[in-house]
A protein has these predicted regions:
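N-terminal "domain-start" segment that seeds a small globular fold
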Residues: 3-31
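Short active-site neighborhood of thiol/selenol oxidoreductases, capturing the structured segment around
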Residues: 30-52, 58
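Hydrophobic beta-strand anchors of alpha/beta hydrolase catalytic cores
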Residues: 40-41, 70, 115
């Protein structure tokens, strides 16, 4: 598992949030809207077994934490497969089509699943474990820490 924490800094300091994308429904999305807010970026792919294992827990944790913005960043597949994944797991938060991998590259995501946890002060933690799915409890604990 790779865990990297960014040093606390002003919310406007993270240039990685200066991206634009397209939601799975075709609407524009601007990453800068996440500045200064607790947020979770979840990098996933529909064929990924760990992503499939995590998805129900991600859906529940997102629903239980309306004060934290969740954004899924899907890649390595076509939009139809991405939409089916979102529908299958009831992911009722914004999911982006990053088919070209540009947002993944911006965050140096080598493989899925991966997370970036943003605190309101702009500091962040990157978590990427290629050997197992994150448990719902670990995800819940990490999300709770964003508000403290």
């Amino acid at each position: 598992m790779v865990v990297l924490s960014g040093a606390p800094r002003a919310a406007a300091a993270d240039d990685r949030l200066q991206f634009t994308g397209t939601t799975l429904s075709g609407a524009p999305f601007n990453g800068a809207t996440l500045q200064g807010k607790p947020a979770v970026l979840w990098f996933w792919a529909p064929f990924c077994p760990f992503c499939n294992a995590e998805a129900p827990g991600v859906s529940r944790v997102a629903a239980a934490n309306p004060g934290v913005t969740f954004v899924g960043v899907a890649a390595h597949s076509d939009v139809g497969a991405m939409q089916n994944f979102v529908s299958k797991y009831g992911l009722n938060f914004t999911n982006l089509n990053d088919a070209d991998g540009s947002i993944w590259a911006r965050y140096n995501v080598p493989w899925q699943p991966a997370y970036v946890f943003y605190r309101a002060d702009g500091s962040s933690t990157f978590v990427n474990n290629p050997t197992s799915a994150m448990s719902q409890q670990e995800l819940s604990d990490r999300v709770s820490a964003l508000r403290s």
